[in-house]
Amino acid sequence: MADIHILVADDAAGQRLDAYLGANDGCPTRSACAHLIEGGAVAVNGETCLSKKYAVRSGDRISVDLPEPHDPTDVIPEAIPLDIRYEDDYLIVLSKQRGLVCHPAHGHESGTLANALVYHCGIDHLGTVQGEDRPGIVHRLDRDTSGLMLAAKDDDTQRALQNLIRTRTLDRRYITLVHGHIAMDEGTINTGIARSTRDRVKMAVSDDPFARQAITTFRVLERFDSTRFDDGYSLVECHLFTGRTHQIRVHMRHINHACVGDPLYGKCDARADQGLTRQFLHSWRVAFDHPVTGEHIECRDELPWDLAAVLDDLAPRSLGRTAAGDEIVPQLGLLEA
């Protein structure tokens, strides 16, 4: 994915955002820019902007995430099983398994969640606001992050769900196991996040004026004692108020408590990572008011077997649960000691 950064000049003030971007070198056509805006790929002054009619102002800092080019005709239906937790005429809440890429990209031409959604719903019954090569996708999970995510069956619902993310009214909570003992039981991490200048695969905390604001709150659920191989662990629930690429993984590394098993931001020590071959990160709960019916929807997802096995192995080393842990851990499907 390429990044474009633009500082709006005085003589451009007042132009519509889609028209302004479409006239800039390096950006696609105006209509394509409109799709990028509606898909959440454009930020103004660090905040995602979903309105193509936004009138740019002198000094605005605009960032555009350009997806890698991909032929949308490649999104063919494939009979990949979907673990659906809620479905109606407008949207789907599903649990994504580890190893499943959300949409086709270079190196992953098929076998993606998008291919599965096209098979399940039909290409004409999925939102295309994110682009025709990302049918139905409202928000993404990293390939090896498991758990709950949303898909939309039409453009209006897709826009409405993305607006819930923008207005921070889509409640998304994740479970992660991190290295070390986090001293405080709860806290908030509020930083800018931008692509790393050292490694373009990674994201990094940044004070660059074009960085996007990222807010994560966390609650420690349980701590586990240290050994000669590791510094102990903390089981944590993270609440996303924004949805930046690798946000939880970057924020946990930023406070010196990287996610266990994380190949990009972690310690890369097999013993300290409890033998995991992927980051210990699971989207366990989503809650929101249905954008069409108004019904309150809440779905929960127990930990998959590989993550649950790690916690079962660590159970004898438990230093005790917090009040939040007493509430949440029993809902994760773990074996009780």
Identify the role of each PLM range.
Residues 76-79, 206-216, 280-281:
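Short coil-to-beta-strand transition motifs
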Residues 1-188, 192, 197, 300-316, ...:
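RNA pseudouridine synthases
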Residues 37, 215, 240, 290-291:
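Short, acidic, Ser/Thr-enriched surface-loop or helix-capping motifs
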Residues 64-67, 198-202, 213, 265-271:
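Short Pro/Gly-enriched beta-strand edge/turn motifs at strand-loop
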Residues 84, 178, 218-220, 259:
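Conserved hydrophobic positions within beta-strands
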